[in-house]
């Protein structure tokens, strides 16, 4: 006869809450860093694009002459505000002694907001990239001449801002993936 004699097998002791929260805290730290990257890069996108101006004789190229560049700055400002708010909330959660995983409602709100802002930033960056492509290469069908040979400084700054905006998209997309993980993960069960 064995030690258990057909009786119910003993259950393993539940894992400590500190051990269960370690991956979540690590993900929260990654999310915090991604939000910080999104904040910094969004600031750079706005600063570089707003300074994309150049005058050549009587001609002038400015970022606010294009709706695509204005949209990029506006979406970057919204992403900046949202990412900064999420950074502050994540930092507060991380530093809190009574840290808990986010509620389902909070996880859904984060997931939806992250998705919306990621796609909005991607759309604005893509529209600005298309405009930059036309500015650099022109369009023979529309009979638009390339302007970057004349407005080199303007095109360089606009291009740098567009590259930075795609970096912001990557940070927002990764942050969105973490939000999705928090929302759709299966709770760990202790058996």
Swiss-Prot record:
Signal sequence coordinates: none
PANTHER family tied to this protein: CASP-LIKE PROTEIN 2C1-RELATED, CASP-LIKE PROTEIN 4A4
Pfam family, one: CASP_dom
Extracellular side: 47-68, 136-157
Alphabetic keyword roster: Cell membrane, Glycoprotein, Membrane, Transmembrane, Transmembrane helix
Stored NCBIfam families: A_tha_TIGR01569
Membrane topology summary: Multi-pass membrane protein
Family: Belongs to the Casparian strip membrane proteins (CASP) family.
Official protein name in the record: CASP-like protein 2U3
Quaternary data: Homodimer and heterodimers.
Subcellular location: Cell membrane
Sequence intervals crossing the membrane: 26-46, 69-89, 115-135, 158-178
Cytoplasmic side: 1-25, 90-114, 179-191
Glycan-bearing residues: 137
GO CC, alphabetical: plasma membrane
């Amino acid at each position: 006869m064995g030690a258990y004699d057909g009786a119910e097998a003993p259950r393993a002791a539940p894992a400590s809450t500190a051990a269960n929260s370690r991956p979540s805290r690590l993900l929260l730290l990654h999310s915090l860093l991604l939000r910080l990257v999104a904040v910094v890069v969004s600031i750079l996108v706005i600063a570089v694009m707003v300074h994309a101006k150049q005058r050549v004789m009587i001609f002038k190229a400015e970022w606010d002459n294009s709706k695509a560049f204005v949209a990029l700055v506006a979406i970057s400002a919204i992403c900046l505000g949202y990412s900064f708010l999420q950074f502050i909330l994540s930092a507060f959660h991380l530093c809190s002694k009574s840290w808990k995983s986010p509620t389902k409602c909070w996880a859904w709100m984060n997931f939806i907001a992250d998705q919306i802002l990621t796609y909005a930033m991607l759309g604005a960056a893509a529209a600005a990239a298309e405009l930059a492509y036309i500015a650099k290469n022109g369009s023979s069908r529309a009979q638009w001449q390339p302007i970057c040979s004349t407005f080199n400084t303007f095109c360089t700054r606009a291009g740098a801002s567009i590259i930075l905006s795609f970096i912001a998209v990557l940070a927002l997309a990764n942050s969105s993936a973490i939000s999705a993980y928090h929302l759709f993960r299966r709770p760990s069960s202790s058996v």
